[in-house]
Amino acid sequence: MTQEELDKIIKKHQHFLKQDCKGWEKMKADLSEEQLEHLVFQNADLAYAVFNRARLYRCTIENCNISHASMVEADLGFSTIKNTKFVDTDFTKASLSDAEFNEVRFSGANLSYARFEWSHAPFCDFTNAKLYEARLNSTYLKSSTFNLADMSFCHLANCCLRECEFVKANLSYAFIHGADLTFAKFDKTDLTEVKHDHGTHGFALACPEKGAFTAFKKIFSKPKRNIWSKDVEPLIVELRVPAKALRSSATSRKCRVSEAKVVSITSLDGERKFDVGYSAHNIHFEYRKGQTVVPNKFDKNRWKQCAPGIHCFITRDEAVQYTDF
């Protein structure tokens, strides 16, 4: 199909959408099994159009609305797709591999059994989408949203899922070997039998599951609200977390514990020793050598990062480098 022929079909489809002329019922765009390689879709409204088994290889799709459409077994491989809506569109068994997506909405779309591998798709919206047994291996999905999505049995090996949201999503039996979930948000997420390994970042607990352990935390020399004042020095407190303490780490290297004993307080370079230091978040919370510190409360939610508890790191260097106050 030529670009001119495609543009004519898109123009006729507008009458189908608006129902504004005689015979509009027969003007719906049906591009099933068409060869559409390298064609350009720009500022087009193709809602409810049919692309089943169409070949859209290396197409450019920009600022389009292709919602409620049917793209069953369509091939969008190596395409570039930007600022486009595929709301409630059916991509069952479609191929979206090696493609470039940017700020694309797949909310409510059916991507079951679709191949979405080796693609670049940051900041995309998959809210309430169905990705049952979809293959997204090695796809870059940073900061995308998967809230309420069905991702059961989904293949996510080696994916970048940093800062993604999975609130109330279903990831049961998903495969996340080698995936990066750092700072991902899990809240009421179904993680039944998720398959992960030593290469999966941000999923396993960063601190020991049981037993006592040593942790480190950055505190400050004075109880001042402005921690960047020249007379306020950052310090490192070494903590001994008892075996009975509750512990959590969400999806980062930062841990939370329900209590800890202050072993030592030193300067960042470790050369000078101190007897007392203060929390950056609560100027009344004191860390004194030899004493046990206990927060007012502790949130038991394993996946909550910013929640009540003693925040700390497993290594001293991580505490030294931490600046997110």
Regions inferred by a protein language model and the residue ranges of each:
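Tandem repeat scaffolds
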Residues: Q3-K8, K18-D231, R247
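A short linear-motif detector with a strong N-terminal bias
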Residues: D7-I10, G290-Q291
